[in-house]
C-alpha cells in the first residue's frame, strides 16, 4: 500500500492517492493493534489524519466518510492501547463526521460500524474518566435521535439508535456497579433493534446487536442500587 501511494501523484490523482494512503494507514493500525506497538498506531493515526485533511469532502463524499471512519477506528485502537480518554473523544468526532454522510445510506455496513464505534468510544471515554455526565449527555442525545426517527419511517436509523442507547446503559452498569434498571432497558432496546434488523435482512447490523445481547447475558449481575 505504501508503494502504491508513493507511486501516485496526489495533485493529479487525488482520490486514488488518498485511497492508497488510507489503506496503508488502516493496515498500520491493525498491525499495531495486534502487536501492541503504540508507535505504529500513532503512525497510522498521522497517516489517516493527513489523508482526511488533504481530501475534500465534496470530491467524493463516500470516500471521505470511509476515511473519517478509518481515522476514528485508528484513534479508537490508540485509545485502547494507551487508555487515553482524549483519543476516544477524537474518535467520536471522526465517527460523527462519517455518520453525517452515511445517514442517507441505510443499508451500508460502514454506517453500522461508524454508529457502533461512536457509541463504544463515548462509553469508553466515560469509563476511563468515571464521568457519568458524559453518559448522561450521550443517553440524552440518543433518546433525542429516537424521538426524531420513527421506526416505521426510518427503521434502520431507529434501530441503530437503540443499539447505541443500549451500549450507554452497559457503560453505566460498568461504572456504577449497580443496576437501576439499565440491564432490562438495554435488553429491551437490543431486542427492538434485532427485530428491525432481522426484518430488513441486515446481517452485519444483526451481528452487532447479537454481540451486545451476549455481553449482557454473561455480565455479572451488579448489586441493586438503593
Predicted regions and their residues:
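Tetratricopeptide repeat
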Residues: 1-5, 24-25, 44-51, 70-74, ...
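Flexible helix-coil transition and linker loops at the boundaries of alpha-helical arrays
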Residues: 2-17, 34, 50-64, 81, ...
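Conserved alpha-helical positions within TPR/SEL1-like repeat arrays
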Residues: 16-33, 62-77, 109-124, 157-167, ...
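Short, charged, amphipathic alpha-helical segments
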Residues: 21, 39-46, 65-68, 86-93, ...
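Short coil/turn connectors between adjacent alpha-helices in alpha-solenoid helical repeat scaffolds
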Residues: 29-42, 76-90, 123-137, 171-185, ...
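Alpha-helical adaptor scaffolds
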Residues: 124, 128, 132-138, 143-157
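Intrinsically disordered, low-complexity segments enriched in Gly and acidic/Ser/Thr residues
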Residues: 130, 149-158, 163, 170-178
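C-terminal non-catalytic interaction modules
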Residues: 167, 171, 183-226
Amino acid at each position: 500500500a505504501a508503494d502504491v501511494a508513493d507511486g501516485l501523484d496526489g495533485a493529479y490523482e487525488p482520490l486514488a492517492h488518498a485511497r492508497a494512503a488510507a489503506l496503508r494507514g488502516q493496515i498500520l493500525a491493525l498491525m499495531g493493534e495486534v502487536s501492541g506497538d503504540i508507535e505504529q498506531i500513532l503512525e497510522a493515526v498521522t497517516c489517516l489524519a493527513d489523508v482526511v485533511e488533504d481530501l475534500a469532502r465534496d470530491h467524493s463524499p463516500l470516500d471521505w466518510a470511509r476515511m473519517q471512519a478509518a481515522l476514528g477506528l485508528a484513534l479508537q485502537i490508540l485509545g485502547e492501547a494507551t487508555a487515553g480518554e482524549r483519543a476516544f473523544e477524537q474518535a467520536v468526532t471522526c465517527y460523527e463526521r462519517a455518520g453525517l454522510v452515511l445517514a442517507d445510506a441505510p443499508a451500508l455496513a460502514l454506517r453500522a460500524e461508524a454508529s457502533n464505534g461512536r457509541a463504544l468510544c463515548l462509553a469508553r471515554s466515560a469509563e476511563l474518566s468515571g464521568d457519568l455526565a458524559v453518559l448522561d449527555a450521550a443517553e440524552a442525545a440518543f433518546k433525542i435521535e429516537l424521538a426524531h426517527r420513527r421506526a416505521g419511517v426510518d427503521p434502520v436509523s431507529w434501530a441503530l439508535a437503540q443499539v447505541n442507547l443500549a451500549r450507554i446503559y452497559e457503560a453505566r452498569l460498568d461504572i456504577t456497579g449497580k443496576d437501576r434498571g439499565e440491564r432490562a432497558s438495554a435488553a429491551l432496546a437490543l431486542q427492538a433493534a434485532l427485530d428491525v434488523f432481522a426484518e430488513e435482512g441486515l446481517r452485519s447490523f444483526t451481528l452487532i446487536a447479537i454481540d451486545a445481547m451476549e455481553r449482557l447475558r454473561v455480565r455479572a449481575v451488579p448489586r441493586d442500587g438503593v
